[in-house]
Amino acid sequence: MSILINNGNDYQLNSSETFNSLKSSPSSTSSLSSISTSSSSSCHKRSKAVDLNRNTSNSQNSSISTAPTTATAANTTPRKTSITIPSKLPSSWIPLRNGNIDYSRYYNTNQEEDNQEQQLQDGEPLSAPTTNNGTTKTATANANIIQDSFETIPCFSSTTNTTITSSRSNPTNSTPTSNDPSFPKQMINWNQFLQEEKDMNDNSSTINDDDKTFYMEQLNLNVGQTPNNNNNNNHGVSETENDLLPGTSKSLIAKYHYQLNYGDENENETNDVREYEYGGGESRKRKSSTTSDDRRPRRGGGGGGSRTSQVFRNTLNKFTFKPKIK
């Protein structure tokens, strides 16, 4: 029997030998470290596979393993774009307390608005919204729901790994699916969102194709392209940040940011537009406006007192990890 190696060396094996040794031609500088074969009396069978592992030594003789092997044909399925989100991340990645994300490490947990205050306990996880969300303090049964901006930040509470799979055939209208019922479905028209982003930007900063690709890929919950941190990037995300959050994609966070900043704004025919003051009071004049009274809040918020925008920026910049792509 003759075995041909990639480098062209021809190894001869006499039929009388019992796989205890292997002799190669004198000109060869390579040798075999092991051969595994199944015991089959018929030729040309797939099960008679020979596994060749070349040794890096200069020895001309190498032992051969006689352990039989079984060749099993694996069923192949088309590759799916999916992401497995660990239920509990190692503490070296993000701060954890009793298996939950320690949000108190990143922002002030005292939130006040209209004489309403709710304290996020140290290490208490934020929860997905429920049907009985209110505008006042929650009851005991709904104690984990944080009011105002925090009540709509979705997080996973499952104890098993969560796999999210979505289709790329129609990214604008595709809806992510998950084996975790607590994961929120798509909740915004992204073409409208992108147009709103363009309207918000001034002449020196517009949403380009790279940014649109970033949003579309985030919508599909894939590891997308993070825009460079330059004039074309108003997302508050550095170039080195990862593109997914624990249980929440940046696109969903951006959706909530958009909803909280502009969801209650109503521009009527009388041009009676409210002046928005976030924290430092920094606001931006719309590009298409001719009056200084037509303003909207600058994305990302103002100074240190910005409650909504700064929290979302902290969320985007801090709660990141590298997901595993199957």
Swiss-Prot record:
Disruption phenotype: Leads to strong defects in host cell damage in a model of human oral epithelial cells. Exhibits reduced survival following co-incubation with a human macrophage cell line and causes more severe kidney pathology following intravenous murine infection. Also leads to higher levels of interleukin-1 beta (IL1B), following incubation with murine macrophages.
Sequence intervals crossing the membrane: none
Bias-annotated ranges (Low complexity): 21-42, 53-78, 117-137
Highest taxon above the source species: Eukaryota
Alphabetical keyword list: Virulence
Signal sequence, renumbered to the chain: none
Annotated region described as Disordered, given as residue ranges: 19-91, 112-137, 161-184, 222-245, 276-326
Expression triggers: Expression is induced during infection and decreased by benomyl treatment.
Function, as annotated: Virulence factor involved in pathogen-host interaction. Modulates host pro-inflammatory cytokine interleukin-1 beta (IL1B) expression.
Protein name per UniProt: Virulence factor CaO19.6688
Organism: Candida albicans (strain SC5314 / ATCC MYA-2876)
